[in-house]
Amino acid sequence: MINRIAYAASTPLALLTLCLLGSGAARADSADSVPPNTVRLGLYDIFYHVHAQDLSGPYVPPGVGIDVQNVQTLYVAYVREFFSHLDLELAIGWPPLTKTEGRGPARLGSVPYNGQVISTARWFGPSLVANYVFLSPEHALRPYIGVGINYTSFYDRNNTAAGNAASGGPTRLSLSPSVGPVGTVGLTYRLDRRWSFYASYSFSEVQTNLTADTAGVIRTTHVSFAPGALIVSAGFSF
C-alpha cells in the first residue's frame, strides 16, 4: 500500500550545479595546495523517522498506518572547493530498494497486516550542500557543517502480495516528489594532497503524498520521512 524516501537536485539545483562546474572562483591558496575538485565514494547508512497520517478512504478501519525499513546504499559525491573554508557538495545515493511495513491492527479482517511488508519502492534523492570547514588547511583533521537542499523522487513502486491482500486486490501506488532542507555535520581527515577520509551525519526533511488505487477505490495518506544518514567515505582530489 505504500513506500518512500531519502536525498537534492531539482531545477534550481541543476542551475546551481552548472554554476559549480563552470565557476572559475579564485582560491587564495599556495601552489602546492590541495586541488579544488574532489570525488567521494562511500556508504550511506539511512535511518527513517517516519510520521504518517492514518490511511484514509473507503473500507479503511481506524489506526491503519505504515513504517519504513532502514537501508544502506552507495554514496557518491562531487565537491568543489571555492575557498579554504567553503565548498559545495553534490551528493547522490544509489537508489536503494526500500520496504514499507504495515503498522496498526494485527489483521485487516482475516488478512495479516501489522509487521507485514506491504510495498516496495526505489527513491532517487540527490542533495546540494554548502559546507563551511573549520580550522586552516594545514590541519589534517577538520570539522565542518553544511546546509542545503534535497530533492527526492520515487519510482518502481509496487505492492507486495501481502499489500494487495490487505488492500482488497491489485493496487497501484503513486508518491509525490519532495523538495526540502538538509543539514550535515562531519569530519574530514586529509592524508595528503590527493587522498582524504570523511565521516558525517546528515538530516533532511522528505515528505510525500501517497495514493493507493485498488480498482478505482482510492486511499491516501501524507507521509513525513525525517531520514538521518550516517556517511563514511574516501575522497580523491584533482
Per-region residue spans from a language model:
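Predominantly the C-terminal beta-signal and adjacent terminal strand-loop region
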Residues: 97-99, 183, 191-238
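Outer-membrane beta-barrel translocator domains and adjoining extracellular loop/strand segments
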Residues: 51-58, 100-107, 155-166, 210-217
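Extracellular loop and loop/strand-boundary signature of outer-membrane beta-barrel proteins
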Residues: 59-64, 111-119, 166-173, 215-222
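Short glycine/proline- and aromatic-enriched beta-strand/turn motifs that initiate or cap beta-hairpins
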Residues: 24-79, 235-237
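Gram-negative (and chloroplast) outer-membrane scaffold detector with strong preference
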Residues: 29-30, 45-47, 77-161, 225-238
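Hydrophobic, lipid-facing positions within transmembrane beta-strands of outer-membrane proteins
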Residues: 37-39, 72-76, 124-128, 179-185, ...
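Short sequence motifs at beta-strands and strand-loop junctions characteristic
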Residues: 66-72, 118-125, 173-180, 222-226
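Cleavable N-terminal export/targeting peptides
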Residues: 1-35
